[in-house]
Amino acid sequence: MADTAATFVFADIAGFTALTEAHGDEQAAALVDGFANEVESELPPGATRVKSIGDAVMLRVPDPGEAILLGLRMTRDVLREHLAFAVRVGLHHGPAVERGGDYFGATVNVAARVSSIAAGGEVLTTGETAALVPDLGGVLFESRGRHTLRNVAEPLEIFAALRTADRGADALPVDPVCRMSVDPDRAVGRLEYEGTVYFFCSLPCAAHFARHPDRFAAA
């Protein structure tokens, strides 16, 4: 069945593979469950969670402005109450075909590819989608240049959606052990080594670093 246009959003936990390797399957599975539940609680009216794919969620949001605001809430608020990890988001607006509750087509493919190039804490969208909401209050768009995305015929200009108040903010630091992006305000531990401060997602990561600082600082 042909679907009316909507914004498709893909969001996942930055560095999730490294987290699984460092902390094990049980903690990783618990993190995924918490992530999906937090995302569900943030959905605006009319939006739906289409499915979960590993640590990622696929969402359908009727309005592109609401989708961008949702993405910004996820990168700032989802997981912040209990966890220190960063979320990355990619989205694109357009038509798709619905089959058994799932959605297919070029729009969905572009949204997924855009999410794959986002950094932790970043909300990326296409120029076409950003142009639909030029006056979204408190939000600005910064070009990230043109990108060639897998299985997308033409290069697309990609934009980062930013809260006006956050413009110029530094990127999130990375846990040197598990390579997870870490929110400094929620980091479980921090250590200084040779003049550099390192932030950690967990006490085990901090302990690993303390035992072998040369190995992890070099990485």
Kindly label every feature range from the protein language model.
Residues 1, 128-218:
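Intrinsically disordered, glycine/charged-rich C-terminal tails and inter-domain linkers
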Residues 1-69, 77:
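Catalytic NTP-binding/metal-coordinating core of nucleotidyl cyclase/transferase enzymes
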Residues 3, 58-168:
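Catalytic beta-strand-to-alpha-helix segment of the class III nucleotidyl cyclase homology domain
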Residues 11, 62, 125, 200-201:
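A conserved hydrophobic position in a structured secondary element of the catalytic/binding core
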Residues 38, 77, 114-117, 208, ...:
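Conserved short hydrophobic interaction patches
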Residues 42-46, 81-83, 183:
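Short secondary-structure junctions
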Residues 49-50, 115, 189-190:
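Short secondary-structure boundary/capping segments
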Residues 53, 99, 193-194:
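Structural motif
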